Amino acid sequence: MAYVNGTTNGHANGNGLDLCMKKEDPLNWGVAAEALTGSHLDEVKRMVAEYRKPVVKLEGETLTISQVAAISARDDSGVKVELSEEARAGVKASSDWVMDSMNKGTDSYGVTTGFGATSHRRTKQGGALQKELIRFLNAGIFGSGAEAGNNTLPHSATRAAMLVRINTLLQGYSGIRFEILEAITKFLNHNITPCLPLRGTITASGDLVPLSYIAGLLTGRPNSKAVGPTGVTLSPEEAFKLAGVEGGFFELQPKEGLALVNGTAVGSGMASMVLFEANILAVLAEVMSAIFAEVMQGKPEFTDHLTHKLKHHPGQIEAAAIMEHILDGSAYVKAAQKLHEMDPLQKPKQDRYALRTSPQWLGPQIEVIRSSTKMIEREINSVNDNPLIDVSRNKAIHGGNFQGSPIGVSMDNTRLAIAAIGKLMFAQFSELVNDFYNNGLPSNLSGGRNPSLDYGFKGAEIAMASYCSELQFLANPVTNHVQSAEQHNQDVNSLGLISSRKTSEAVEILKLMSTTFLVGLCQAIDLRHLEENLKSTVKNTVSQVAKRVLTMGVNGELHPSRFCEKDLLRVVDREYIFAYIDDPCSATYPLMQKLRETLVEHALNNGDKERNLSTSIFQKIAAFEDELKALLPKEVETARAALESGNPAIPNRIKECRSYPLYKFVREELGTEYLTGEKVRSPGEEFEKVFTAMSKGEIIDPLLECLESWNGAPLPIC
């Protein structure tokens, strides 16, 4: 069912759709609900596909956050902005209306009046009024030298703001010439970015102060600056020449300055950038939670669809279904199932919450991020200045669409969701590096031969605590810190851009955490591979020694100790390999202790045969241990060396798993190393590779490849 809210842009509605096929939706709830149909993953895939298109065509009401992200982040990739010619007539009509009303003496806010709390003042000098508007709004502070960069809005956010502002003004309610929109478009397409102050807006009445610097460049204000495609600072004259904007600087006509500055484009533009990344990071968190379950030898029943169906929340159901898909058929899950069956009392009946309730934890965060995405998408397609020029009714409407509450609220909510994702990630990472919880992995994920000289991810765990603490602080809301502004005219204001900026910081921190966790998971995967090869070596060696020493007596007769082998191998199966492998034959480590206990127990059960030296099991213990000490350390080192040279006896199970594309990307494409204290390379050097790739969006394809065979539904309940 399609919905129609009964509004048009004040000009001809040429969509030609049969109204019989539409359901009236005057309050827009139907459209909002319909936008949330389908899976979150499918929406992310659409966003990625749209992000990669070479052209963004602006029509006024069809802009997406992925298009904003594309223009903001890909200023050197040739992505171009095009304006719909169909919008020209409507834009011109509103501009002409302003000039006509001015000539007729009509009294309109910002055209013949002062601004804000001083709107009781009047003037007939419409152009001079717009010039003064831009002058007094140029109140930002940049600093000088290195300080200037710290106080300048990131160029990516400025590009986003330019795109969103053009889109709003294209709808023909703002009273501005089409030529000005074309000029801003040329700046975008030639990678020329005005310098905007980082701070100074409360996003009501729009983002007045930062947007005034775009207007300042257009009008050639001497304090205006821009940055060119090579990073060189440009004067307004140089910017116009490089962009090919002809006719000189613009002399603003009545209402045009107000049209440029009185909108929410900076806050919503940055919010669009933030949400594009947040949606992808949410999917990454789902997949990494599944990988966490794999390397932790978790029980996959936590993803069973019935559990989540009975809870009803769509975000939770989808998160569980995605994890279920990754774990379905996983070689790690199959191996873990055998371990659980062999000794069900070796670990708790249920996995800890960071694993078992990860769908319940992530689901609401995904719903919040998705809802915020739609809210911002509505905002970037809205007309959000004042007054609005309604040509069809021949009037200017004075209202408050400049109030950026959708931005402030959605960004506060998104930041809280990001912090929750980070909290889960920290809990999972803390389990992963702790040998008390991680089901046999070494402490700190240390990969070397000598744990006394290898502390693995200990520094990374400290860094993760720092990241998580800062992220939780950022989760505090911005919107409850409103101050009454502009002589108490702007007595409530959204703080939209401030909240967007803080959410951008939160996304950066979540990327740091995601990077660290992903490299840690890859280390754990390699350690499980090493564990499997070493355990096989130990079992084979114990079996060989048992057969040689325990099978025959001194005269070649079968010895009672031959029945010990099965129990000795069970010891190897049950003992965590990394609890002893650095010195496998040490009497203080569990392997030799448990092997000896097993032999002693058999000896105690041997009865009177122990009195006979030829049939005594106890007499065999020393020979067994001596033989094992002579052979096992060499075999262990041989197995390690074979794996390090790329010739392990047992291949890495990850290649049989749906999570393999992410591992392959991190290890092969980015060339990260298995970390040990024996090597020079630090964890941070490997993290840098992954973080850089993540920031460039290079992780998207391997992430989506993990899920390319998912049909968008949970496995059937059977």
Swiss-Prot record:
UniProt pathway annotation: Phenylpropanoid metabolism; trans-cinnamate biosynthesis; trans-cinnamate from L-phenylalanine: step 1/1
Molecular function via GO: phenylalanine ammonia-lyase activity
Cross-linked sites for 5-imidazolinone (Ala-Gly): A204-G206
Keyword Lyase appears in the UniProt entry: yes
Catalytic reactions of this protein: L-phenylalanine = (E)-cinnamate + NH4(+)
UniProt xrefs under InterPro entries: Aromatic_Lyase (IPR001106), Fumarase/histidase_N (IPR024083), L-Aspartase-like (IPR008948), Phe/His_NH3-lyase_AS (IPR022313), Phe_NH3-lyase (IPR005922), Phe_NH3-lyase_shielding_dom_sf (IPR023144)
Keywords: Cytoplasm, Lyase, Phenylalanine catabolism, Phenylpropanoid metabolism
Compartment(s): Cytoplasm
Domain of life: Eukaryota
E.C. code: 4.3.1.24
GO BP terms, alphabetized: cinnamic acid biosynthetic process; L-phenylalanine catabolic process
2,3-didehydroalanine (Ser) sites (modified residues): S205
One of the record's GO cellular component terms: cytoplasm
UniProt-listed Pfam families: Lyase_aromatic
Post-translational modification: Contains an active site 4-methylidene-imidazol-5-one (MIO), which is formed autocatalytically by cyclization and dehydration of residues Ala-Ser-Gly.
Binding-site residues, (E)-cinnamate: N262, Q350, R356, N386, K458, E486, N489
Active site: Y109 (proton donor/acceptor)
Classification via PANTHER family: HISTIDINE AMMONIA-LYASE
Quaternary structure (record): Homotetramer.
NCBIfam families (alphabetical): phe_am_lyase
Family: Belongs to the PAL/histidase family.
The protein's role, per its UniProt record: This is a key enzyme of plant metabolism catalyzing the first reaction in the biosynthesis from L-phenylalanine of a wide variety of natural products based on the phenylpropane skeleton.
Name of the featured protein: Phenylalanine ammonia-lyase 3
